[in-house]
Amino acid sequence: MEELIAQYTGADEDSRLTRQYIAQLEYDTTMHVLGNYLQPGKRVCELGAATGRYSLKFAQMGCDVTAVELAPEQVKILSQKAKDAQLDIKLFQGNACSVPFVADSSQDVCVILGPLYHLQTEEERHQAMQEAKRIVKPGGIVAVAYISRFFVAGMFAQKFPKLIKPEVLSELLETGLVSDSDADSFFRVGYFSSPAEIESLIIQNGFEPIRHLATDGFSRYIANGVNHFTPAQYDTWLQNHLQTCDESSLLGSSNHGLIIATRI
């Protein structure tokens, strides 16, 4: 856990989601999908809020927002941003696996857009989903993001060829983990799922998936082109992407996937 906190200490998640079109696509797609459930007055809890790129937006939309973040430095940044924007957000430093400060059946929506990238044991993943089930009202919504292990293997081939070793790829494909000392710390503290595995996790914990989409589609593979779009071209590409991101054949190759599910 200390290594994970260190990974995100000093990380600028806001810039990551806005500095390039390829990352902006992730944010815009996620907000487009979540917007269907974020009417003013809705109670929304984000587990793994980082510096608040999403939680602050939810509050600006009129939602009653509770934000939980593991890394203390990120909590401080989010707190200051909320204060500067005069937004009322209930903010807690904590682990997505245990949020006792959030009341049972108190939330209309629970958003988990980062923790499942890093919960490396099956027990932890189930704990996080059980906490989501506990705090969400019956019939409420959970939104869960994950990183595809199949995409990560492709990223290694493209950017980190020194990791193309039998033992690295076998571990990644069989467990979703990367323990090789040559790997960047992000990968060593990560957990990378498969679309089927994440769906199973959600179903096992009392949710019914209603939508499963490829948040990035295949755009990461053509990042150089996407990042050099004009604003008009980006808008056109975004609209095309939003029409195709539910295509199941794109799920494994997309960097991020997103599942929307209802609490049974």
Please give the residue ranges for each predicted region.
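Conserved class I S-adenosyl-L-methionine
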Residues: M1-G48, R53, K57, I141-L172
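Class I SAM-dependent methyltransferase SAM/SAH-binding core
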Residues: R53-S98
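A short acidic, Gly/Pro-enriched loop at the edge of an enzyme's catalytic core
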Residues: P100-C110
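Acceptor-substrate binding/catalytic loop of class I
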Residues: L119, D182-A196
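A short glycine-rich, Lys/Arg-flanked "PGG" loop and its adjoining helix->strand segment in the class I
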Residues: H126-P138
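C-terminal lobe and adjacent flexible extensions of AdoMet/dcAdoMet transferase-like proteins
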Residues: N205-I264
